[in-house]
């Protein structure tokens, strides 16, 4: 329970914060204590989902195209993969690793005698490692809140705790965080079934290091929105020989400056009048006198805060640029990003993304090998029908980027290479099966040849009968 409490108190708040920034609940900008408290003024809280943009882009780039698993002929492995939607599972795991820096997969053998994979929530799952030079997992823990009915028929929130080791699964009775754990049931298992996927060796999410920049961008955009709103409420300033709160005004008449109570009352009246002027967007200023004893001019006009458009917009642009730069995520809205860039130029523009993806994929591939190793262990214990050695598997990741395949093929053909027509047909719009196009063209050519032979009177009896034109007699 100490380890669960440690995870709940020390790790879960960080993971929850990362989840909030992914979902657009940027905690810094929406915290009431971090913004203006002035009544009567705009207080917009503009939230920008950079976290979601970064995580979704990195995930789509790396695993948007399905991971290809190359293996020898193995019907049992094909059966297992057909029973699991591994494309979706890989996407969920990669997204969790990108968001939280870690992801968890649980593998079990179902009632259908097939191994199944489930994605666990990183906010309620952790793995305990040994103290070896190369630390190995010794226990996986999952704790999640459930609602239970108490003795007074009232619903209570309690934690359902599960643990796994290499040979035992334990389920505990619902309990509170500070209560004793009581075993509900135990089962014997034959493999450590929980896999921890790491985003990097530090288990840091892709947008975690730019959260301070996201907070600054939120604040800058919010301040701009506040200014644009308050700009419509310009303050009227009247300067002249008027009775205001200044010394010498009629408010001072009959007031003994040495009387503390009267001074406090006068101060309160001044504050009330200042508030009234502020609420009315009006400022009364008493005119003064020049060195020659002449009264200064009387005037009236509106004042408002000056807005440095160029400086403010440049500041926000720098923040947005730094967010993309330090997260290795290209800004797809940048008009200089795409244009008519060649394939090589585009590769340079996303070089940071490609390098980051290489690191992330290496870590993810370790988890994939563990997945099939666990499946092999469970299969060996149950049926021994799996013939593939997990260590012989090859995983291929393909960048999910737009490519100009037609131009590439054109350049290859110009260089003297020959490309099969059936291969080219796959680039036609709405074509899913290039082979069907090839077969259709072959049928059309055959029909044209037959019709030509019929027209020239050289068709065979079979061609004429198949054509349905006429029947000939054989002498």
What are these regions (language model features)?
Residues 94-99, 130-133, 151-153, 225-229, ...:
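A general structural signal for short secondary-structure junctions and capping/turn motifs
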Residues 71-77, 298-302, 350:
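A short, surface-exposed helix-loop junction/capping segment
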